[in-house]
Amino acid sequence: MSQLPMSANLKNNKGDQQSRNERHTFVLVHGGWCGGWLWRYVAPALRERGHVVTTPTLTGLGERRHSENRTATLSTHIEDIVAHIEMEGFQDVTLVSQSYGGMVATGTLARIPDRIRSMIYLDAFVPEDGKSLVDCFSPEDQARFMTFKDEDRSIPPFPLSYLGITDPALVDFMTPKLVNQPWRTLFEPVKVLPCPAHVRMSYVRCTNSVGDHFDRIMERMTRDPNVRTATIDTTHLCMLTVPEATVKTILDLEEIG
């Protein structure tokens, strides 16, 4: 895959500088309709640099599509990640989330802040307290989602072309792996607590991505002096379209190698 140019605008963080050869623990949280397979190219690259990396799949999605797909909620998915981190015995976790995964990561931080050292949102939702993912969308999109809620049906994925995926190889790779999203996961509000002082916060905007809701989130993050921001010149699924740039951005934000 060709690597597109990357532009990063990193703001100073009040935390201590981290050694570039320090070993980190990364838990990568995929977005909606996907699974742990979304990190197929990023996870090995981080492991090759000596880091611990896991890519859990959320209930009802990916290879877990047979499990509670109709009834899973956002709380279910938050519990997936909380339990994963606790059962693995992880501490000082860098939690990397993409798209819907930002809702899950935010809820996870509220549950186990003592186990998290850093949050990286990759073109992800960063909810405000008491808001659901649907609240972030336009009225037109909300009406579309409401149809599935009213009919108690899971929500089919967006067309890959809408997400900027046009490479035939990527289309062939992704199409059989996409799974309908349990509608309850998008409608449940999330509890957001103030970010603990010890947790580093970063937001990455994919500049060719869909959705002005991500632009609004980026604007909000840019105004926060405690959030480091970066951009990648690619579409919404940066970990598949430009995995090298995605890895570099993650490592630069964490100031590690």
Model-predicted regions and their roles:
Residues 52, 58-94, 110-111, 135-138:
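Active-site loop/oxyanion-hole signature of alpha/beta-hydrolase fold enzymes
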Residues 207-240, 245, 252-253:
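Conserved loop-alpha-helix segment in the C-terminal half of the alpha/beta-hydrolase fold
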Residues 70, 110-111, 115-116, 120-156, ...:
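Flexible "cap/lid" loop of the alpha/beta hydrolase fold
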Residues 203-205:
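Short beta-strand/loop motif that positions the catalytic acidic residue
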Residues 95-97, 122:
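Short beta-strand immediately N-terminal to the catalytic nucleophile in serine-hydrolase-like folds
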Residues 176-193:
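Active-site nucleophile elbow and catalytic-triad environment of alpha/beta-hydrolase enzymes
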Residues 97, 101, 105:
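Gly/Ala-rich beta-loop-alpha elbow adjacent to hydrolase catalytic centers
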Residues 22-65:
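Conserved HGGG/HGGXW glycine-rich cap/lid loop of the alpha/beta-hydrolase fold
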